[in-house]
A protein has these predicted regions:
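Short N-terminal amphipathic alpha-helix/helix-capping patch enriched in small hydrophobics
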Residues: 7-11, 33-36, 64
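ATP-binding glycine-rich phosphate-binding loop
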Residues: 20-41
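Juxta-kinase regulatory segment immediately upstream of eukaryotic protein kinase catalytic domains
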Residues: 1-22
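Residue-level "edge-of-site" marker
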Residues: 28, 84, 139
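ATP-binding pocket architecture of kinase catalytic cores
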Residues: 43-136
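Short acidic/polar alpha-helix capping motifs at helix-coil junctions
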Residues: 1-3, 28-35, 51-52
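A cross-family kinase active-site recognition segment
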Residues: 110-170
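Short secondary-structure boundary/hinge segments and terminal tails
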Residues: 33, 89-90, 144-145
């Protein structure tokens, strides 16, 4: 989903800052709900994602980038924002953080046993990463996710044992 319109000129500005090949095409990516994401087709045949952070301030995005790099440095495969010519990993444009990310050509995670087992292995690897400074103890994606889930469960009578466990963990 796109909340911020991105022109070919906007995309070219970011690509130029990263020293990347010229832009051939740009199209919105489906599936997001809090940011604007676009697939960029480059002249050398490669593809990148241009992400405009609509729900976080540039300062929050900078912190998120630091955490993402920390996780990657500790061996967890995760798309790290590309470094721009000035060493930064984002560009602030019209008060919003803009970045380029590697495009991962893959679908959504399947719900079969092998896929879920693979997910569990990656989650275990993630949990083995030492905690870095500044890591938040709350989780949100443009809103307070857990609190909203609990309110919804109350309103709809949709509590499950897993949600109750999350609720207990969230008040610790």
């Amino acid at each position: 989903m796109a909340y911020t319109q991105v022109s070919a000129e906007d995309a070219a500005e970011l690509l130029d800052a990263a020293g990347m090949a010229g832009l051939v095409g740009i199209s919105p990516l489906e599936g997001g709900w809090a940011n604007s994401n676009f697939l960029l087709q480059l002249a050398d045949g490669s593809r990148l994602v241009l992400k405009v952070w609509n729900e976080r301030t540039p300062e929050q995005v900078e912190e998120l980038i630091e955490h993402t790099c920390w996780i990657a440095e500790h061996g967890v495969a995760t798309p790290v924002p590309l470094q721009l010519g000035d060493g930064a990993r984002m560009l602030v444009k019209d008060g919003l953080a803009w970045m380029l990310l590697p495009f991962v050509d893959a679908g959504w995670l399947a719900s079969d046993s092998d896929s879920l087992y693979s997910l569990g292995k990656v989650m275990a690897q993630l949990h083995a990463v030492p905690v870095c400074d500044g890591l938040s103890s709350s989780y949100y994606m443009g809103f307070r996710l857990w609190e909203d889930m609990f309110e919804h469960a109350d309103a709809e009578g949709a509590w499950s044992p897993f949600l109750r466990q999350l609720e207990q963990e969230s008040v610790r």
